[in-house]
Curated annotation (Swiss-Prot):
The encoding gene: ybeY
Compartments, as annotated in UniProt: Cytoplasm
Keyword annotations: Cytoplasm, Endonuclease, Hydrolase, Metal-binding, Nuclease, Ribosome biogenesis, rRNA processing, Zinc
Keyword Transcription regulation listed: no
Organism per entry: Stenotrophomonas maltophilia (strain K279a)
Annotated protein name in UniProt: Endoribonuclease YbeY
Cofactor requirements of the protein: Zn(2+)
EC top class, as a word: hydrolase
Residues the entry annotates as binding Zn(2+): H121, H125, H131
Amino acid sequence: MTRGPVRLDVAISYALPRAGLPAAVSFRRWVAAALKGRIREADLAIRVVDAKEGQSLNRHYRGKDYATNVLSFPAEVPEGLPKGVKFPLLGDLVICAPVVAREADEQGKALNAHYAHLTVHGVLHLLGWDHEDDKEAEAMEQLEREILAELGIDDPYAGER
């Protein structure tokens, strides 16, 4: 576990009007919570998109022709990077605002809490976490619960049990 302050650079862009969307400071707080104790230095980008762009990216990169809530694109460490040279670039997150809003409504969740959950979920993917099998999924979900609890956000999986 990494201790000490985190140097964090989060570039946030909005591909649609910001009204009703979380402020950049909220996204930064959620990212910092996900990284706390795990990594000391990180650069990443978050892009909040509409359904059309979300669908296009999901189709292009995952072969799935629908908009999804969050896409994670981990950075690749350049080959031949000298040992000891830091490479703080984590990658990019794409969050599809209409999908997040629809899911929050359908699941009876506060919109900001759902954005926080999906941001944390996406950052964990950038750190190498996955949920391809039940054991991985449970471990990742438990970590998400712990991070969100530190942010004062209820268990996002409580209604699924």
